[in-house]
Every structure is written in C-alpha cells, then in structure tokens.
C-alpha cells in the first residue's frame, strides 16, 4: 500500500461561523457543505485539491491540534499575498527560504498557522525536512 496524498483535513475550531468566514471570505475556500445543526456542527470547504472540514469543538471532545502547521501550495504566492491584504487579512509578507520555497503565513481564528507556499521547483517540493 502507498499513501497517495492528503485527502481530507479536519480542524476542530472554537467558533464554526467565525472560522467559516475566515476560510471562505478571507482565504477564498469554497463552501461545499455546511451542517450547523449536526453534532458537532461542521462545514466542508474546498480549495484546489484540498478538502477541509471545520468541526465545532465540543467540551466532550479531546482538544488536539496545537503546534500543528499546514503548508498549502499556491501557484503564485505574491499574487495571493496581494489578494489577502486587499481582504484585510493579517498576513506576513512573502519570504524566500533556503528549503526551496517562497511563502506567506497567516493564523486562523484558532491560532492554527497556515503557510501558503510557491515551490521553486518540484525537487524543492519533494524535499524531506
């Protein structure tokens, strides 16, 4: 068996509606399903090939995810930076790193760090850290 890739990412969030606004209106993900009356309330969004589900954290659930960072590939990180600043998203300016990518960083309402990266080439994308 081989792993083909990341098919689904689920984040537990403190406020589903606030996070939904951040990911859809500010970052540009498309809402494909929103079930605010489910247990827990959830929403699924799509961005490129990534499917992202946001689940409202309930007190009965274990808290997870702190210290987790996400690297999401974009075609043009500089263009995406301009789009985010036009939407008044707090975003760190593009930075080139020695590991082979140019990236920007944002934090979602639950303090998950999201790195949007444009890789210099396929070998940089495939590099193991």
Regions found by a protein language model. Give the residues of each.
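Generic preference for hydrophobic
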Residues: 45, 52-54, 106, 116
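N-terminal beta-strand motif that seeds the catalytic metal site of vicinal oxygen chelate
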Residues: 1-18, 68-70, 120-129
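Active-site/binding-pocket entry motifs
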Residues: 51-52, 58-60, 122
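Vicinal oxygen chelate
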Residues: 2, 5-14, 32, 43-46, 61-129
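Core segments of cupin and vicinal oxygen chelate
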Residues: 10-51
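Conserved catalytic-core motifs of eukaryotic protein kinase domains, centered on the activation segment
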Residues: 35, 56-57, 127
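A short beta-turn/loop motif at secondary-structure boundaries
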Residues: 35-38, 60-62, 97-98
């Amino acid at each position: 068996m081989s792993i083909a890739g990341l098919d689904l990412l689920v984040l537990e969030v403190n406020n589903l509606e606030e996070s939904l606004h951040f990911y859809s209106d500010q970052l540009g993900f498309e809402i494909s399903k929103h079930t605010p009356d489910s247990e827990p309330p959830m929403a699924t969004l799509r961005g490129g090939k990534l499917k992202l589900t946001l689940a409202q954290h309930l007190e009965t659930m274990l808290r997870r995810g702190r210290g987790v960072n996400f690297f999401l590939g974009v075609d043009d990180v500089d263009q995406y930076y301009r789009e985010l600043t036009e939407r008044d998203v707090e975003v760190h300016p593009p930075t080139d790193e020695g590991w082979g990518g140019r990236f920007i960083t944002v934090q979602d309402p639950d303090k998950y760090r999201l790195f949007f990266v444009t890789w210099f080439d396929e070998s940089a994308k495939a590099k193991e850290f």
